[in-house]
Amino acid sequence: MEIRVIDTKENKLLGRKEIYFEVIHEGEPTPSRADVKGKLVAMLDLNPEATVVQYIRSYFGSHVSEGYAKAYESKERMLYIEPEYVLRREGIIQEQEE
């Protein structure tokens, strides 16, 4: 699996970097969000606790997927801005049992 960063934007108002990327996964299934997040964090020297992979889109018959990630300045900023379902999906907050 290889990740290529297409574009990086600095969003000062929300205190985050917005990263558009491509994942080349020839002969492999679409990689998980956790795998992509781990590689992006290592590649761009980001804080893993304040980074969220918003989406990874694959197209039928293609070995290239495109994605979008957000890297916040701090975990507190991310918790304030990101919707609860995204935080649950990323495993940052746990579901409460009723």
Swiss-Prot record:
Keywords: Ribonucleoprotein, Ribosomal protein
BP terms from Gene Ontology: translation
SUPFAM superfamilies: Ribosomal proteins S24e, L23 and L15e (SSF54189)
Keyword Ribosomal protein: yes
Domain of life: Archaea
Keyword Hydrolase: no
Gene Ontology cellular component list: ribonucleoprotein complex; ribosome
InterPro entries: Nucleotide-bd_a/b_plait_sf, Ribosomal_eS24, Ribosomal_eS24_CS, Ribosomal_uL23/eL15/eS24_sf
Gene Ontology molecular functions: structural constituent of ribosome
Gene3D superfamilies, sorted: 3.30.70.330
Segments forming a coiled coil: none
PANTHER family associated with the record: 40S RIBOSOMAL PROTEIN S24
Family named by the database record: Belongs to the eukaryotic ribosomal protein eS24 family.
Protein's name according to its UniProt entry: Small ribosomal subunit protein eS24
Chain's gene name: rps24e
